[in-house]
Structure formats: C-alpha cells, structure tokens
Amino acid sequence: MDSLALAPQVYSRKDKSLGVLVANFLTLYNRPDVDLFGLDDAAAKLGVERRRIYDVVNILESIGLVARSGKNQYSWKGFGAVPRALSELKEEGMKEKFAIVPFVAKSEMVVYEKEGEESFMLSPDDQEFSPSPRPDNRKERTLWLLAQNFVKLFLCSDDDLVTFDSATKALLNESQDMNMRKKVRRLYDIANVFSSMKLIEKTHVPETKKPAYRWLGSKTIFENRFIDGSASLCDRNVPKKRAFGTELTNVNAKRNKSGCSKEDSKRNGNQNTSIVIKQEQCDDVKPDVKNFASGSSTPAGTSESNDMGNNIRPRGRLGVIEALSTLYQPSYCNPELLGLFAHYNETFRSYQEEFGREK
C-alpha cells in the first residue's frame, strides 16, 4: 500500500496524447528561472515514460523552443527563439521548394525515405529541379526532421491550408513500407503538438471535407497562454480580490478582456468606473458656486445670494476637487450596503431613545 501511495500519478489513456503532454510540459518549464532540464526529471514530474518526453523535446527542438546541451539534458530557449527558427526553416525550405511545395496541392508524392542511394521519385520533367539526395537517410526518419519538414510545408506554401493526405504523401513513403502506419501516427503526433501550441489549427477542406491544417504562425503563440514567463509577470501581481470598501468593479480585469473596447467603456458610463481627470483638464476647469451650491449639497445657513455677494469661490486645487466632486457625483449605489447602513442608523436611534428614557 505504501509503495502504491508513493508511486507517481500516471496519465489516463486520454492524457497520453502528445498534445496534452506538451501543454503540461510547457506549464512546467515555461518559466524565466528555467535554463536547463533533464528528460528523467521531466518524466518523473509529469508521470510518463521518458520516451514520451523525448518525443516532445524533439518536436519542440524542431522549432527552436529547446536545444540539446548534453546527454538527456536540454536547454530552454523560450518562445522568443521561435520566430528566428521559423525564418531559418523557411529559408531552407525555399531552396527545396520545387521538391516539396508545388506538388502538395496536386497530391503527388515527392519526398521518399528509402534505404540505399535512390533519388527522390519525381517525374522526368521535374527531376531537373530536384535537390541532390541526402546521404544520411536514417536521419530523414527522425521525429525532429519530420517535424521540420512538416513546418516547411506551411512556410513555403502560398496557401496556409495543407491537407493531411498531401502532407503524408509529400513527407512519407507509402509504397511497400511496412512501417507506414507508424510513420503516419508520428505525423499525427507532430500535428497534435503544434495544434495544442496554436501554431496550426485543425480544420477541413470545404469542398472535399478532408482533414487539413491551417497555419496560424508564431504570433498566435504569444496571443494565447503559451507565452514567455517573463512577459506574464506583469499579470502576476494584479490582485484577484478587491479590498473591503473599494469598488466592486475590477477595472484591471475589464481591461484585460479581449472583447472590451473603448466604445464599450463609454457606453457603460460612469456607473462602475472611477473618473480619471488629467492635470491639463483640471487647470482649465473654472468651478462656479452657482452650479453646485444648491439643493441638498448646499450647507445649512448659506444662500446663493450671500455667496455671490461675497464673491466666494474655491481657490487652488482643493477648490477644483471640491467642484468636481459635486459636479460628478458617482451614480453607483449598492442597495445591500444602504440597507445595512439604514439598519445601523435605526438601531443607533433606538439606543439613544432608550438612553434618554433612563435619564
């Protein structure tokens, strides 16, 4: 029983997907104080096998998010290194553009991974544009390079939509390959990781309803929750709870909402927001006692004629504040607080009456 209690919590079948695993991985290591991390440490903290962590870091390494620094050791580069890595991948992919991208839209098989020194299987008319075969065919089958080639399909294509069938035919070898199903599954893993990072999104072709992926780019990573830890430090010190006696409206939370705009704030009026007046506006304000020294706000024993006769006007910044506080009275009202204060007032008056009777 003790050994079971000390055993790390493992993922369920649903949580074993690389899309979920990479989200937990980024939550664990996407911090400004992380420079190096080990595969064994990550596997122990996330409760998965080390090979699953190895798959994650290989895919993340393909876009420059991490870099290998030693045996089972990786350095965290952060999302700031992703745009530069994508730019380098695009530059490399443009050199191979005639060998990959133009044939993806035609659903033709371009890149093949075969044993031996066999060239890419292109048509005779297209072989003059094909690059020279790479000597290291074993490296072509790595997850890292497969992820890079998958990204190149989007970076070097005129259309941001790539079907999964086209990507499979462009990157994998279907003819007489017993491991084709395994390779397709690896390509699915790569797509799931990039989808969870909001680098691409799952969709379908409107005409054929075939599964496809749309390229979103590195900007969407920063717009979503996968941002650098240093960039999110400004939001960590914002209190989530209000202090007693302050406004019920959380102004900072309203500003952080994506759907909130200046027009919406103007439409809502001054009910739940405080009025901020610039110093330039305060200098131009000339309060008039005739406008605000009336009604219930007029002190007892004063009159309009008396004030105007004596030419009494508030002076300085204090007078401006007094005038503005009278002109712009907040319309915010909490009925619960008013009821509570009325109850206290009634109780206090009853105590005064009883105390007067005793005397």
Swiss-Prot record:
Residue stretches in coiled coil: none
Keywords, sorted A to Z: Activator, Cell cycle, DNA-binding, Nucleus, Repressor, Transcription, Transcription regulation
Inducing stimuli: Down-regulated posttranscroptionally by auxin.
Top-level taxon: Eukaryota
Any single GO CC term annotated in Swiss-Prot or TrEMBL for this entry: nucleus
Disrupted-gene phenotype: Increased root length and smaller cotyledons. Reduced root meristematic zone but longer cells in the differentiation zone.
A Gene Ontology molecular function term of the record: RNA polymerase II cis-regulatory region sequence-specific DNA binding
Localization of this protein: Nucleus
Spans annotated as Disordered: 255-274, 288-313
GO biological process: positive regulation of cell population proliferation; regulation of transcription by RNA polymerase II; response to auxin
UniProt keyword annotation of Transcription present: yes
InterPro entries reported in the protein's UniProt record: E2F (IPR015633), E2F_WHTH_DNA-bd_dom (IPR003316), WH-like_DNA-bd_sf (IPR036388), WH_DNA-bd_sf (IPR036390)
Residue ranges the UniProt entry marks as DNA-binding: 13-78, 138-217
Pfam families in the cross-refs: E2F_TDP
Biased amino acid composition, Polar residues: 293-309
Tissues expressing the protein: Preferentially expressed in proliferating tissues. Highly expressed in young stalk and young flowers. Lower expression in young leaves and mature flowers. Detected in cotyledonary vascular tissues, the shoot apical meristem, the base of trichomes, the fully developed stomata, the central root cylinder and in the columella of lateral roots but not in the primary root tips or in the leaf epidermal cells.
Family statement: Belongs to the E2F/DP family.
Biological role: Inhibitor of E2F-dependent regulation of gene expression. Binds specifically the E2 recognition site as a monomer without interacting with DP proteins. May be up-regulating E2FA and down-regulating repressors of cell cycle progression. Promotes cell proliferation and represses cell elongation. Regulated by proteolysis via a ubiquitin-proteasome pathway.
Subunit structure: Monomer. No interactions with DPA or E2FA.
PANTHER family: E2F TRANSCRIPTION FACTOR-LIKE E2FD, TRANSCRIPTION FACTOR E2F
Domain-level remarks: The two DNA binding domains are required for binding to the E2 site.
Name the UniProt record assigns to this protein: E2F transcription factor-like E2FD
Organism, scientific name: Arabidopsis thaliana (Mouse-ear cress)
